[in-house]
């Protein structure tokens, strides 16, 4: 009975999450202000995170939103779970899709667990190859993370400086986060991570490399986790949110986002929170690229859940405004909306297929197929502005020129404003107003603009997906098909593309070491 009660311990609530945030030290800079987590400009992002807590005990969502920890056997939030099977991957993808519907965009809690899944693979394989003890350290960290149902941010993207130079070649060595000292009790790091989502209202952030590191880049090979209010950490934050409404409330109006520069001003990281350190041990350097791409891989898999949701949100708005404009039956409208729906289904199918073609890593973590995740993410990124264009086309210019809310609820001009907003006679003017105001928020607001850029670059731009796909695809074997058909080769062996994962990055480092020895 005690064991059952222990395993069924109540999960963290949104209210507990908010109370924990309020206890954190103020280190969030909005402009020149230093603010705490109770600043109202951060509420929109917290409201999105709320959706990841509120549905774990609801029959409709529980199976998707919870999992059983492979380490403790406890029921945990799926945003804290390490994928152990194809089913886990599929449930994560479906969970992401349905929760994104509820918030009108990014659910903002995937980055942390995507980085933890990557670390569960890399730390184990490093230990096996180098005799390090990172995996046991990681498991202890993970158990605490799961027990407390923590929200994590992932800090991957560096400032990068001169884009044509490698980390060790930069004029300013701090343009990539680096270890400046390794001690018995930990390390000191200096640098900055940029374009980081949700950090001001996360419990912890997980730092990982943003790229492949060569033999000369040892100082930049580092991964660790810290609380978001850690000593020496400064969060330069740009919150995004919708204009508050005095007269018309709607769930979507309460959502928001925060993007951050995380500055590490000679920050001490305790030993038990370090998962990779090339400065202390150059033999660990090959694992920087492996980890960087493994996280990107999991995050692109996540995008195969969230981007279909985003497309469906845009298609939903396009269908509604077409009805309210009285043009829903027009063939050109049907054709345009079918394009959005088709992209949504194809991207989701790429994610599903990558889960179906997944493989188990030596640590037991399930890894989706890399080419399929990148194909899905690239398709989404290449089409996001086309989808917004379709919504804009069907909506008309009113989404950018709609008078302010007060005009529609003014005693003097309100009735006139509603009169001239009328379109489909079967639809109440208030609903038409809500529709156009909602699409205005989607397309021309601060947060709407952010989501459009995130649709291209979040998780990696289409160019990065292209590079990854071409690195992994065996193009020489692919040529054999044409060689046979054109009579250049007399035989054709059966061609089936094998499943691939980011493990190939280790081979890239090995080749770099051989080149270095020759010179």
Short names for language-model regions:
Residues 334-338, 366-374:
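Short, charged, amphipathic alpha-helical segments
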Residues 50-53, 322, 344, 348-351, ...:
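A structural signal for well-ordered alpha-helices, especially hydrophobic packing surfaces
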Residues 371-514:
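Alpha-helix capping/hinge segments and adjacent helical runs
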Residues 6-69:
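Acidic/polar, glycine-rich intrinsically disordered N-terminal extensions of enzymes
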Residues 43, 47-50, 143-146, 309-312, ...:
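Generic structural signal for well-ordered, non-transmembrane alpha-helical segments
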Residues 302-360:
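Extended amphipathic alpha-helical segments enriched in small hydrophobics
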Residues 159-303, 473-512:
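FAD-binding core of flavoproteins
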Residues 67-204, 210-224, 229, 234:
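Glycine-rich flavin
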């Amino acid at each position: 009975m005690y064991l059952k009660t222990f395993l069924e311990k109540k999960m963290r609530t949104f209210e507990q999450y908010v109370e924990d945030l309020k206890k954190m030290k103020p280190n969030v800079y909005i402009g020149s202000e230093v603010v705490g987590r109770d600043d109202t400009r951060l509420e929109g992002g917290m409201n999105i995170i709320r959706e990841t807590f509120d549905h774990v005990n609801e029959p409709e969502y529980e199976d998707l939103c919870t999992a059983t920890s492979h380490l403790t056997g406890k029921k945990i939030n799926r945003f804290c779970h390490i994928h152990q099977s194809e089913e886990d991957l599929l449930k994560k993808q479906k969970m992401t899709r349905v929760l994104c519907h509820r918030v009108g965009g990014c659910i903002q809690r995937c980055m942390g667990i995507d980085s933890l899944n990557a670390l569960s693979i890399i730390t184990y394989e490093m230990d096996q190859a180098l005799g390090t003890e990172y995996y046991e350290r990681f498991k202890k960290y993970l158990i605490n993370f799961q027990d407390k149902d923590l929200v994590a941010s992932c800090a991957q993207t560096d400032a990068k400086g001169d884009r044509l130079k490698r980390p060790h070649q930069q004029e300013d060595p701090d343009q990539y986060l680096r270890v400046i000292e390794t001690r018995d009790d930990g390390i000191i790091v200096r640098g900055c991570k940029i374009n980081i989502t949700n950090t001001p209202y996360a419990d912890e952030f997980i730092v990982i490399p943003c790229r492949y590191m060569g033999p000369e880049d040892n100082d930049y090979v580092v991964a660790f986790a810290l609380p978001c209010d850690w000593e020496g950490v400064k969060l330069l934050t740009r919150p995004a949110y919708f204009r508050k409404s005095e007269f018309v409330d709607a769930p979507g109006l309460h959502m928001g986002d925060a993007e951050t520069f995380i500055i590490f001003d000679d920050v001490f990281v305790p030993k038990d929170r370090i998962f990779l350190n090339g400065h202390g041990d150059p033999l660990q350097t090959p694992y920087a690229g492996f980890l960087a791409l493994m996280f990107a891989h999991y995050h692109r898999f996540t995008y195969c859940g969230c981007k279909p949701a985003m497309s469906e949100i845009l298609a939903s708005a396009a269908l509604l405004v077409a009805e309210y404009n009285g043009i829903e039956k027009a063939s050109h409208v049907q054709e345009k909306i079918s394009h959005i729906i088709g992209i949504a289904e194809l991207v989701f199918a790429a994610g599903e297929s990558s889960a179906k073609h997944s493989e188990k890593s030596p640590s037991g973590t399930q890894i989706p197929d890399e080419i399929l995740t990148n194909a899905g993410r690239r398709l989404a990124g290449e089409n996001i502005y086309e989808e917004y264009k379709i919504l804009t086309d069907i909506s008309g210019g009113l989404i950018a020129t709609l008078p302010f809310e007060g005009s529609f609820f003014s005693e003097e001009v309100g009735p006139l404003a509603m009169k001239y907003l009328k379109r489909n006679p079967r639809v109440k003017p208030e609903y038409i107003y809500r529709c156009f105001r909602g699409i205005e928020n989607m397309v021309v607001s601060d947060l709407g603009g952010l989501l459009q850029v995130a649709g291209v670059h979040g998780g990696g731009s289409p160019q990065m997906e292209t590079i990854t796909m071409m690195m992994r695809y065996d193009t020489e074997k692919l040529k054999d098909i044409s060689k046979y058909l054109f009579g250049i080769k007399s035989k054709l062996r059966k061609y089936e593309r094998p499943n691939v994962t980011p493990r190939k990055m280790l081979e890239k480092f090995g080749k770099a070491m051989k080149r270095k020895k020759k010179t």
